[in-house]
A protein has these predicted regions:
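Extended, polar/charged low-complexity intrinsically disordered and coiled-coil segments in eukaryotic
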Residues: 3-12, 16, 133, 141, ...
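Generic beta-sheet signal
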Residues: 60-62, 79-82, 134, 154-157
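Phosphate/nucleotide-donor binding subsite
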Residues: 75, 79-128, 185-186
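Conserved nucleotide-sugar donor-interacting segment of glycosyltransferase catalytic cores
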Residues: 112-182
Length: 187
């Protein structure tokens, strides 16, 4: 089954989108992310690419990013948690701690509003053909299952496990991460 998403590689000059095949049906695709602009920008880029191919794209993220998303001509729907905390230096210091930061994000930012995130995503995916979510969006697979729509988890986080052959570089343990690469998939 094709959802109209096609990856293209080109070694020559780019082919204008108007000259590309348009045999794919128009789809409504919801992309969801939370966190900093570094977390959001990959989904904005995907949304712009899909929009250029005539798909309806919705970025579902924190309310604090509404103006940025809508200024690009991309659909926006709010999903909690709102990421306005990224502008608070005290909160950022706490969640960027090399040892405890990730745990704090999960325990203090994501899990307390998991039910609200689920409810917001249920509303955002109304009529959607596909849900694309960041790895740490725990409500996404539940929403996709409830709605009966396909779900894709996109991983762009440097600490995420992208491959059994390429373990992540752990903050504060760069040397250890590099030295464990010889283990390959055993690590």
């Amino acid at each position: 089954m094709s959802w109209g998403v096609r990856l293209e590689a080109s070694v020559g000059p780019a082919v204008p989108i108007t000259q590309r095949s348009t045999n794919y049906p128009r789809s409504r695709i919801v992309l969801t992310s939370h966190g900093s602009l570094g977390d959001l920008h990959p989904y904005v880029a995907i949304a712009l690419g899909l929009k250029a191919r005539d798909h309806e794209t919705i970025v579902a993220t924190g309310e604090c990013y509404r103006k940025k998303i809508e200024a690009l001509g991309i659909g926006f729907l709010p999903v909690r948690p709102d990421s306005d905390w990224v502008t608070n230096p005290d909160v950022m210091r706490r969640i960027m701690h090399p040892r405890w930061g990730l745990e704090r994000v999960i325990r203090e930012v994501l899990l307390p509003v998991l039910r609200e995130t689920y409810e917001d995503l249920l509303a955002a995916t109304e009529g959607a053909d596909l849900l694309v979510a960041m790895q740490a969006n725990y409500a996404s697979p539940l929403v996709a299952e409830t709605k009966g729509i396909p779900w894709a988890s996109a991983m762009h986080l440097p600490i995420g496990l992208a491959s059994a052959y390429d373990p992540p570089v752990l903050p504060g343990f760069v040397g250890l991460s590099r030295n464990l690469r010889f283990l390959g998939p055993a690590f």
